Amino acid sequence: MSKQEKTINLSESAQVDQQSVQPFPRSRKIYVEGSRPDIRVPMREISLHDTPTDFGGEANAPVLVYDTSGPYTDPDVIIDVRKGLADVRSAWIDARGDTERLGGLSSNFGQQRLNDAELAKLRFNHVRNPRRAKAGANVSQMHYARQGIITAEMEYVAIRENMKLQEARAAGLLKQQHAGHSFGANIPKEITAEFVREEIARGRAIIPANINHTELEPMIIGRNFLVKINGNIGNSALGSSIEEEVAKLTWGIRWGSDTVMDLSTGKHIHETREWIIRNSPVPIGTVPIYQALEKVGGVAEDLTWELFRDTLIEQAEQGVDYFTIHAGVLLRYVPLTAKRVTGIVSRGGSIMAKWCLAHHQENFLYTHFDEICEIMKAYDVSFSLGDGLRPGSIADANDAAQFGELETLGELTKIAWKHDVQCMIEGPGHVPMQLIKENMDKQLECCDEAPFYTLGPLTTDIAPGYDHITSGIGAAMIGWFGCAMLCYVTPKEHLGLPNKDDVKTGIITYKIAAHAADLAKGHPGAQIRDNALSKARFEFRWEDQFNLGLDPDTARAFHDETLPKESAKVAHFCSMCGPKFCSMKITQEVREYAANLRIDAVDVSVEEGMREQAERFRQEGSQLYHKV
């Protein structure tokens, strides 16, 4: 530990990132109560201005949007990262009566870290003794679902996915939604708790919800639900403090990360993870082989099953919700990568490939998979079966190594399901557009519709610095085809560690991709926000346009670069076309002209309307400001 690290006492000095706790403009946090008072599902309500009298003068109903920010954007909640978030799920877990509280940590490494006095100043001070399933019990959401039980978590996510859809319809927020094309998915008109239970029992969806992550606000991942996105954080050997990683977490969920993966490979991985989980309202995923490798000094050949098993228990007792495990990297697949342009690009995949070759033995994650399942179901940790042989360039897409591993992941999925363990499948990578659907179709076939979770895919390799765009294209496509969760890519991909701005850019890019996929699939209510923003745009309600967007700050800043005065926010034009060429203003005048002449078809006499409108502009001296 460095001299500086020794002097920092995080339990006294840690502070929340102030940018992450600011409420969004004209937004308030609301909570929708379920069948019991402690099921309180958060949503963000955006209030809108009335339509100006020029456009009919009507009130506009508030719009609800899915909210991943947890209590951080609730001004009524006092945030103290030193104490962590409030407990959400303990009462639900206690009521099921199938877990027990341990007397302390049971992993060897966890005990070592706890007994290391030098780490006291870095430690999160409010650690609870972990829970574990009672002997012979299975505490996974899949197990409950297959018993016909609707858990509080299932009810919670049904309310969250449905977003008060019936009320939105009654308020006129969904007068129009295009029919989607879902490629055989089973998307209902309304999400119910029973539908959630059925999807989890079938294996088509998962609720990542470790029994030791009780601060969690449950969410669901599956092709018949809203497309989710994941954001990555984590320190490295090159730096980053624990406080910085917690700040990355809160910043990421502010902008829409549905889950967060802690990919730390540097110092104090155990302590960093504790701070992250205790302050996270979203599921946390990890790649346990990274920490296991750190424990053997970075020498892959020295990894053992026993050490890896202890790492799984250590992380499960902290509350990690899903593990990426590269159990499909088999010895026979490694030679198939020899002629690739970019070889094996997955860190986890390369670690296991090196171990297999060094020992000339089969991957111990594969041979011990049943034992891993026993650990997973004792804590309800979900599998994210890693694609260690994913293509790292479009030249390598859809090759024998990639699809051979995918077939093995399908085999492992069925083993996990025999244990009633929740499971999703990781996917590529770098894939040109014409090969993306083949990836989705093959995954559905091999893995029997288990949720697919992809990194992009990147659709071209020629744009370093813009890979959030090259991958966002592929993400939107594969999300439409049936992918359940998209792992974000930042502009720094392949170039360096992302900063806060890069993280935000990556998340917003992927929120766009996910939402575009929801629209294309025809998810119920997906078009509500689009309709509201389009109406605000046509009525020149500038503030509502900003506030309904995914990133109000950037929208407002771009507008104000050229029209900074407050009066510009009631103007019936923007700087793109100016007052004389605003198509929407002209269209409104044409509508009025047609109405006055009692012309039924608005598109009749457009040319005459244009001439009359131009003359009116000249007479009014182009003064088009209106007070709201």
Curated annotation (Swiss-Prot):
Catalysed reaction, written as an equation: 5-amino-1-(5-phospho-beta-D-ribosyl)imidazole + S-adenosyl-L-methionine = 4-amino-2-methyl-5-(phosphooxymethyl)pyrimidine + CO + 5'-deoxyadenosine + formate + L-methionine + 3 H(+)
Q: Which GO terms describe its biological process?
A: thiamine biosynthetic process; thiamine diphosphate biosynthetic process
Residues reported to bind substrate: 232, 261, 290, 326, 346-348, 387-390, 426, 453
Annotated Gene Ontology cellular component terms: cytosol
User: Pathway involvement?
Assistant: Cofactor biosynthesis; thiamine diphosphate biosynthesis
Q: Which InterPro entries does the annotation name?
A: ThiC, ThiC-associated_dom, ThiC/Bza_core_dom, ThiC/BzaA/B
Q: What are the recorded GO MF terms, alphabetically?
A: 4 iron, 4 sulfur cluster binding; carbon-carbon lyase activity; zinc ion binding
EC top class named in words: lyase
Keyword Zinc belongs to the record: yes
As to how many cofactors bind and how, the note says:
Binds 1 [4Fe-4S] cluster per subunit. The cluster is coordinated with 3 cysteines and an exchangeable S-adenosyl-L-methionine.
Which cofactors does this gene product need?
[4Fe-4S] cluster
Q: Where is the composition biased (Polar residues)?
A: 7-22
The UniProt family comment states:
Belongs to the ThiC family.
Q: How does it assemble?
A: Homodimer.
Alphabetical list of PANTHER family matching this protein:
PHOSPHOMETHYLPYRIMIDINE SYNTHASE, CHLOROPLASTIC (PTHR30557:SF1), THIAMINE BIOSYNTHESIS PROTEIN THIC (PTHR30557)
Q: What is this protein called?
A: Phosphomethylpyrimidine synthase
The encoding gene: thiC
